[in-house]
Amino acid sequence: MTANFDGARFRQVLGHLPTGVVIVTGLDAQAQPVGVTIGSFVSVSLDPPFVGFFIGKSRSWPDISEGTLFCANVLSDAQTELCWRFGKDPADGATNRFDGLEWQKSANGSPILSGILASIDCTVESVTQVGDHRFVLGRVTSLNTTDVKNNAMVFYKGKVGGVAIHGE
């Protein structure tokens, strides 16, 4: 970090920009489900269909990336507990994140969590180091929406909540 740069101020200012929240899931080398909460998921390209996200020092990401397939589970505003469950590092005493959860396999075999708004299956196209994070570019192979009527979850000023669209 640059000598006069205030990282805390940077986070505080950028916290004013709401971001969507997804849980990226996959299978580890033993075909066990793994996942991590992501607050930087973005659409990158329509043709070809690419999405992307930034990942920090997650202990779950190496297990997911080993298989080169993942599913982005778009969270609803009713899934706060799920967001924090997958946001906590497993080394911090967290139990298996999938214990007691309902999920099914996506088209690529990755977990689709119950109650989400949408799922986006991808293959890892590239992983690029960018500063203190890695940018994961995923090629979309299938995508679906669900019948869940909740609003999307957003991360805003250090908290998660829902977003309401005016005029709906």
Language-model features and meaning:
Residues M1-E168:
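Basic, polyanion-binding surface patches
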